[in-house]
């Protein structure tokens, strides 16, 4: 008998593999039986059946009578839109808040610090529900505003009609991710030698100009890895839109 058959570890591993195969077979059998019981199958024919539900935000024309495949396509485009807009706005907010945390102005430091501390302590799902039920559904029934029209039916901006659901998800993602980006930017700025700050001040450059031209370019290598992680988190967190 080969040596490996005499080892107890081999038989333990064999039993584990057999158990996993049996569990997978049982799982597949249960799925097949339940799908047949509900009138579905293991094919993709269900994709062409009527979806039967409405979507609050649609980048393309959609009706409940359209197929599941079209509903998935429209939903994918909605996710892509909120992710791209969220990345742009969250980066802008995060860089501004991170720069403010490194400012000499005590008021700016306090405001940005309070924003980061508050937002990072509250779960994102709770923030999304707040923006939806309290902030946007609390808007007036009739549109108000000039260039931007606000109402609890949605927001109209530069020819774009955004539903309250989309605005709630976008605002929540931007505010939440922006707080994390602010901390990343602050850390990157603090990693730059203080001599660089003294150098641009000695040249008579303003704080803002020195930050943009001297400090931030040097802080970028330290910021990018963590910033990429936050971008991925924003994309994953966009799935919480199902809550609103």
What is each residue range found by the language model?
Residues 1-244:
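Transmembrane alpha-helices and adjacent helix-loop boundaries
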């Amino acid at each position: 008998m080969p040596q490996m058959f005499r080892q107890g570890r081999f038989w333990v591993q064999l039993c584990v593999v057999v158990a996993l195969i049996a569990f997978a077979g049982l799982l597949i059998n249960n799925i097949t039986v339940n799908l047949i019981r509900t009138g579905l199958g293991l094919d993709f024919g269900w994709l062409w059946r009527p979806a039967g539900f409405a979507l609050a935000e649609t980048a393309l024309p959609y009706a409940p009578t359209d197929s599941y495949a079209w509903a998935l396509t429209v939903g994918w485009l909605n996710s892509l839109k909120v992710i791209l807009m969220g990345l742009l706005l969250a980066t802008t907010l995060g860089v501004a808040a991170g720069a403010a945390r490194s400012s000499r102005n005590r008021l700016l430091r306090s405001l940005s610090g309070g924003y980061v501390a508050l937002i990072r302590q509250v779960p994102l799902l709770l923030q999304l529900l707040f923006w939806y039920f309290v902030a946007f559904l609390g808007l007036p029934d009739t549109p108000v505003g000039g260039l931007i029209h606000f109402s609890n039916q949605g927001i109209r901006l530069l020819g774009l009609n955004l539903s309250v659901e989309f605005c709630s998800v976008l605002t929540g993602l931007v505010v939440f991710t922006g707080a994390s980006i602010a901390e990343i930017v602050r850390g990157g700025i603090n990693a730059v030698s203080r001599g660089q700050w003294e150098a641009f001040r000695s040249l008579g450059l303003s704080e803002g100009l020195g930050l943009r031209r001297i400090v931030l370019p040097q802080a970028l290598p330290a910021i990018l890895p963590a910033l990429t992680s936050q971008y991925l988190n924003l994309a994953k967190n966009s799935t919480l839109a199902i809550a609103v």
